[in-house]
From Swiss-Prot:
This is L-seryl-tRNA(Sec) selenium transferase. HAMAP family: SelA (MF_00423). It comes from the Bacteria. Belongs to the SelA family. It comes from Serratia proteamaculans (strain 568). Its cofactor is pyridoxal 5'-phosphate. Keywords: Cytoplasm, Protein biosynthesis, Pyridoxal phosphate, Selenium, Transferase. Its EC number is 2.9.1.1. The gene is selA. It catalyses: L-seryl-tRNA(Sec) + selenophosphate + H(+) = L-selenocysteinyl-tRNA(Sec) + phosphate. Pathway: Aminoacyl-tRNA biosynthesis; selenocysteinyl-tRNA(Sec) biosynthesis; selenocysteinyl-tRNA(Sec) from L-seryl-tRNA(Sec) (bacterial route): step 1/1.
């Protein structure tokens, strides 16, 4: 070790001395000596590494209390940070999907700070069932005989297969063997559930006779999977749920449909593309339907199974149900969300997902023009700003080929360099409330469909 390095190391104050610094003592009192000592130790290690690599002290060594405050703020920043979702994807899986309605937020808040009647029957003063209240609402809204709640739709499919067709064959069209995010495939779920997959038909065409010919004494379930994250078009044929349900009834076999997303309302009445509704499938004779809570439904992450009472009872009694069950916060949010559907006339304003999906393009255009006027002076000389029409997508595998007309504020670098755009996007992601846009065609696009706090965005981009 050189003499210069030894001199630099000797300038690093001991942690005990730093803890007695008048500017640091309040932080110790507020956050505890254990945490502050650990952060100071990290700073010392960082300083030692700088000396080792560059033969100098870090610039922040002139003010240890300030460096500690910055490290403390970084350490305490929540990993689930609120962001401005200007990506153009409303139900963005990586950004948490559906925003909860205010009644759902209030219900979760109430449940967090108090003991609740999760599994307590007030009438009989005994144990109740945690799914009961939500199941009753789902039965009212879908016409189902009963319902079961688990932690996501993949879990719903897994539980359904394991409880209804263990060790049996499950017949599915080859064109419906979907893969969802994270390389999670329907055939893999079937293997985990202990079922044997029987593919019928072809990728683009499957007929009722294909299902009929596959039925034997080992068949346990006839299943359809809604291809919610892709679309097969052209020379196609598929068996509808009513036909499959009739075939199942003829052979004494249950039928099930995995909707993936699923909607409890007719989206077409809001000017949106139609999405299969659980209640219509049940009315067509399907025995079990699975769908998600945090997609088009607009609630918390949950897997929902509705259908015949006897079949739901088998799901509730299966050992996997306890492993996959949801807690009080999910149930509180889901119950409050479902209650909004009892007032369909108000749903468009009360449910954030529906409100964002149905925003008229003129509203986003007006917002883009307002932002353009305010922000242009701040980026003059570096970026050209424009208000431009664009297309939003619903996201999370819902209506994959459908787009929603929207409007964006775009940023084009004056130097024409992609690196300049990347640097701008990186800087915005580092903001206290990160701004998430998308880079396309040499521009950074801020799709304004999901923007409901213009002033907050202006303040963030002006910082």
């Amino acid at each position: 070790m050189s003499t210069e390095s030894q001199h630099l190391y000797s300038q690093l104050p001991a942690i005990d001395r730093l803890l007695r610094d008048p500017a640091i003592e309040p932080l110790v009192a507020q956050h505890g000596q254990t945490l502050i000592s650990e952060l100071l130790r990290q700073l010392q290690l960082q300083a030692r590494e700088t000396i080792k690599q560059h033969q100098r002290l870090p610039d922040w060594c002139a003010d240890w209390p300030q460096a500690l405050g910055a490290r403390l703020a970084q350490q305490q920043r929540p990993s689930l940070a609120p962001v401005f979702n200007l990506s153009g994807t409303v139900l963005h899986t990586n950004l948490g999907r559906a925003l909860l309605a205010q009644p759902a937020i209030e219900a979760v808040t109430r449940s967090m700070g108090a003991a609740v009647t999760l599994e307590y029957d007030l009438d009989g003063a005994g144990r109740g069932h945690r799914d009961r209240a939500v199941a009753d609402l789902l039965c009212q809204l879908t016409g189902a005989e009963d319902a079961c709640i688990v932690n996501n739709n993949a879990a719903a499919v897994l539980l359904m297969l394991a409880a209804i067709a263990p060790g049996k064959q499950v017949v599915v069209s080859r064109g419906e063997l979907v893969e969802i995010g994270g390389a999670f495939r329907i055939p893999d779920v079937m293997r985990q559930a202990g079922c044997q997959l029987v593919e019928v038909g072809t990728t683009n065409r499957t007929h009722l006779k294909d299902y009929r010919n596959a039925i034997n004494d080992q068949t346990g379930l006839l299943m359809k999977v809604h291809t919610s994250n892709y679309s097969i078009q052209g020379f196609t044929a598929a068996v509808d749920e009513a036909e499959l349900a009739q075939l199942g009834a003829e052979h004494g076999l249950p039928t099930a449909t995995d909707l993936g997303s699923g909607s409890l309302i007719d989206m077409a009445q809001y000017g949106l593309p139609a999405e299969p509704m659980p209640q219509r499938l049940l009315a067509a004779g399907v025995d079990l339907v699975t769908f998600s809570g945090d997609k088009l439904l607009g609630g918390p992450q949950a897997g929902i199974i509705v259908g015949k009472k006897a079949l739901i009872a088998r799901l509730q009694q299966h050992p996997l149900k306890r492993a996959l069950r949801v807690g009080k916060l999910t149930l509180a949010a889901l119950e409050a969300t479902l209650r909004l559907y009892q007032q369909p006339e108000l749903l468009g304003q009360q449910l954030p997902t529906l409100r964002l999906l149905t925003r008229p393009q003129q509203a986003m255009q007006a917002a883009a023009e307002r932002l353009l006027q305010v922000l242009t002076p701040q980026f003059t000389g570096h970026f050209q700003l424009r208000a431009e029409p664009c297309w939003s997508q619903i996201g999370s595998g819902s209506l994959p080929v459908d787009r929603l007309p929207s409007y964006a504020l775009t940023f084009t670098p004056q130097d024409g360099r992609g690196a300049t755009l990347e640097a701008l996007a990186e800087r915005w992601r580092a903001l206290p409330q990160p701004v998430i846009g998308r880079i396309n065609d040499g521009r950074l696009w801020l799709d304004l469909r999901c923007l409901e706090q213009e002033d907050a965005l202006i303040e963030a981009l002006s910082a």
